[in-house]
């Protein structure tokens, strides 16, 4: 009836014709802009009848690991694939050495492309050259130089956060592990980001809202996202939360300024480190602080939840780690030296990262790039380096098995002491990236993770809820994320030592 009504009105024919023309233009624009780089084989293409490639995108979001594996099984080194951000290149780990320090292959533009950093509300994922430089320098230089001074305050703050956020009742208590860990990390690390008491809840809401908005928007064709973002409820909620974050952090900046003026103490926070790293260049300090906080929160929570779920199923590993914590703490207290000597814990974190990596190493070309084998990466093209050598039997015997002692043993082999450490990226282990653009905050992350796990091990027993095991991760598109909704049972225990 509606079709008949439209066709019988004076404007009916033009409306129908206009709809057909607009649809055709959208179809042609979308399919012509998704070029096939280097005439490489294109996987997961929806074909001419998959309008705006919606079916192909949803297939990638649902079944990316199988699609990527089939690509490397068939084409070995490099291929193109239609994903939820357009057509991307997927390259084998053999390309890692060419990527590691290439000046035209950038990390932040890749993050911005993945998470819509060019759109309002998504600013904490944006890439802006001055801000990118300040962020890297502040982490690589100022944070790294201050890390020794941060260990004791972090240990105290994380211990307090665990007391506040984890159950204090006797007997076994069921918790949603991801929710508790998020709030623990947000509160325990707040001193370097924001001292406002509302910060922990804000940063948890921000991370959740960003994830939901990014996923919801990624379901739409790339060319429509700028328009759709203005109406999607998830995007509007993210925009609202970001606005409240600006207000919260402005309030915190005023408080910090007054506190520093009255005490004269050396500030150990990103607001001050950004100033030092800026060298007088202008930047948005609120957005920059949110960017670093989001990147840190996501990685820290992911790693800690993954290892705690593994520990809940392995009482022997828990016992061995507790012995190590007691021995190291009684000798070194809270210090960088102590964290270095937690070698079994270091190995367990690195093995979690090997078995369940958080994502591929991704780059975007900011200029045309030609690699040694003639592969051309066009400006604006995104490319991901696969980490599948981390599951390679030739590199890691019994690779499918989670062996928390693997890298502990490797560190005892000649020449392996450094490369087998959690914070040491290699072409065979891309958990923190690789080369000069490997995660600059990995030393801070390792410190927070080890301190947090020490507190949990000493203060709590942990086991699976309802006997459920093996549910450590959930996969979405190309990411292998911690199962943040997993439930465990925890019980307060009397620690052998007070830390």
Curated annotation (Swiss-Prot):
Pathway(s) per entry: Secondary metabolite biosynthesis; terpenoid biosynthesis
Assigned keywords, A-Z: Glycoprotein, Heme, Iron, Membrane, Metal-binding, Monooxygenase, Oxidoreductase, Transmembrane, Transmembrane helix
GO molecular function, one term: oxidoreductase activity, acting on paired donors, with incorporation or reduction of molecular oxygen
Superkingdom, taxonomy of origin: Eukaryota
Cellular compartments annotated: Membrane
Group of enzyme by EC: oxidoreductase
KO phenotype (gene knockout): Impairs the synthesis of austinol and dehydroaustinol and accumulates the intermediate compound isoaustinone.
Primary location: membrane
Residues engaged in binding heme: 439
One GO CC term, this protein: membrane
Entries under Pfam families matching the protein: p450 (PF00067)
List of glycosylated residues: 483
Catalytic activity, EC: 1.-.-.-
GO BP annotation list: austinol biosynthetic process; dehydroaustinol biosynthetic process; terpenoid biosynthetic process
Parts of the chain that traverse the membrane: 10-30
Cofactor entry: heme
Topology term for the membrane: Single-pass membrane protein
InterPro entries assigned: Cyt_P450 (IPR001128), Cyt_P450_CS (IPR017972), Cyt_P450_E_grp-IV (IPR002403), Cyt_P450_sf (IPR036396)
Protein family per UniProt: Belongs to the cytochrome P450 family.
Other comments on record: In A.calidoustus, the austinoid gene cluster lies on a contiguous DNA region, while clusters from E.nidulans and P.brasilianum are split in their respective genomes. Genetic rearrangements provoked variability among the clusters and E.nidulans produces the least number of austionoid derivatives with the end products austinol and dehydroaustinol, while P.brasilianum can produce until acetoxydehydroaustin, and A.calidoustus produces the highest number of identified derivatives.
Function description: Cytochrome P450 monooxygenase; part of the gene cluster B that mediates the biosynthesis of austinol and dehydroaustinol, two fungal meroterpenoids. The first step of the pathway is the synthesis of 3,5-dimethylorsellinic acid by the polyketide synthase ausA. 3,5-dimethylorsellinic acid is then prenylated by the polyprenyl transferase ausN. Further epoxidation by the FAD-dependent monooxygenase ausM and cyclization by the probable terpene cyclase ausL lead to the formation of protoaustinoid A.
Protein name: Cytochrome P450 monooxygenase ausI
Organism per entry: Emericella nidulans (strain FGSC A4 / ATCC 38163 / CBS 112.46 / NRRL 194 / M139)
Classification of source organism: Eukaryota, Fungi, Dikarya, Ascomycota, Pezizomycotina
Gene: ausI
């Amino acid at each position: 009836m509606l079709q008949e009504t439209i066709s019988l009105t004076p404007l009916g024919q033009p409306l129908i014709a206009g709809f057909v023309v607009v649809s055709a233009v959208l179809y042609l624009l979308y399919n012509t802009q998704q070029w096939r780089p280097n005439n490489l084989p294109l996987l997961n293409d929806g074909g001419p009848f998959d309008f705006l490639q919606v079916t192909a995108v949803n297939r990638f979001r649902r079944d990316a690991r199988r699609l990527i594996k089939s690509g490397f099984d068939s084409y070995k080194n490099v291929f193109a694939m239609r994903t939820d951000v357009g057509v991307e290149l997927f390259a084998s780990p053999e390309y890692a050495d060419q990527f590691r320090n290439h000046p035209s292959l950038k990390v932040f533009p890749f993050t911005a492309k993945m998470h819509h950093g060019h759109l309002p509300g998504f600013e904490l994922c944006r890439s802006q050259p001055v801000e990118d430089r300040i962020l890297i320098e502040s982490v690589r230089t100022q944070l790294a130089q201050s890390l020794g001074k941060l260990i004791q305050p972090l240990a105290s703050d994380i211990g307090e956060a665990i007391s506040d956020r984890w159950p204090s009742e006797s007997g076994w208590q069921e918790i949603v592990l991801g929710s508790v860990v998020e709030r623990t990390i947000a509160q325990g690390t707040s001193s370097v980001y924001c001292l406002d008491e509302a910060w922990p809840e804000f940063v948890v809401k921000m991370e959740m809202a960003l994830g939901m908005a990014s996923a919801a928007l990624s379901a739409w064709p790339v060319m429509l996202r700028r328009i759709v973002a203005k109406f999607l409820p998830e995007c509007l909620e993210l925009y609202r939360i970001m606005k409240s974050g600006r207000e919260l952090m402005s309030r915190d900046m005023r408080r910090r300024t007054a506190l520093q003026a009255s005490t004269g103490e050396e500030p150990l926070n990103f607001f001050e480190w950004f100033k030092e790293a800026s060298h007088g260049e202008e930047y948005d300090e609120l957005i920059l602080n949110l960017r670093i906080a989001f990147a840190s929160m996501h990685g820290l929570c992911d790693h800690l939840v993954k290892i705690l779920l593994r520990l809940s199923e392995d009482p022997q590993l828990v016992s061995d780690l507790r012995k190590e914590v007691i021995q190291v703490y009684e000798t070194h207290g809270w210090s960088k030296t102590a964290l270095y000597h937690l070698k079994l814990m270091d190995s367990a974190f690195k093995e979690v990262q090997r078995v369940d990596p958080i994502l591929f190493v991704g780059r975007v070309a900011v200029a045309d790039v030609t690699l040694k084998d003639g592969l051309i990466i066009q400006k604006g093209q995104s490319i991901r380096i696969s980490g599948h050598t981390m599951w390679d039997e030739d590199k890691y015997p019994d690779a499918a098995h989670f062996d928390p002692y693997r890298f502990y043993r490797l560190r005892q082999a000649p020449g392996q002491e450094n490369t087998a450490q959690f914070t040491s990226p290699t072409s065979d282990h891309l958990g923190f990236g690789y080369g000069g653009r490997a995660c600059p905050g990995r030393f801070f992350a390792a410190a927070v993770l080890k301190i947090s796990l020490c507190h949990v091990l000493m203060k709590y027993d942990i086991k699976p809820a309802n006997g459920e095991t093996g549910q450590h991760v959930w996969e979405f598109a190309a990411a292998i994320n911690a199962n943040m909704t997993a439930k465990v049972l925890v019980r307060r225990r009397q620690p052998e030592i007070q830390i």
